[in-house]
Amino acid sequence: WIVVTGTNIDYPILQGSTNNTYLRTDYKGNHANGGSIFFDYRMAEKYSLNLNAVIYGHNMTNGTMFRAIRTWYESATRNSTAETMRIEVYTADSLYIYTPFSAYRSDGSDFATTGFASYDSFVSFLDTISSRSVLGRNLTYDSDSKICTLVTCTNNSGNVKERYVLHGLLTQVYNFD
């Protein structure tokens, strides 16, 4: 489950065998233009093993799914709102809390990298995504850090590959046992 405080993002997260599985399918298995919020299919089944937990959702014009990311990104209060925003991911056994540290628009896909050859390559990845950010935040990260990446389309008809990308740095984990 995902909740982003200060927004209406409050949805179950699914994971399919491909990234197309839940693109136009709801959590009940029915066709839905809005699809579902879903993890990248390449992520490890055990959530805690992922260095970069990539989560996709549509930018629906009716305000649902990840539309709130676009609304937040385009707002004049983006930086001040990010100060109190939290990304919460609930699994069966834990709550993972992330603090936003990077946000940008991208027409690439390297932000969705889920496998890293080494911890040094992961830190290099963190440096890259941090340098792209429009946020004025300088959170400290290192090779032991973990992040989540929220991704939604911009609905830019001139560039259909362009995405809004929001990265959160894992700051707390609460175990339910």
Regions found by a protein language model. Give the residues of each.
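Solvent-exposed, non-transmembrane regions of membrane-associated and secreted proteins
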Residues: 1-177
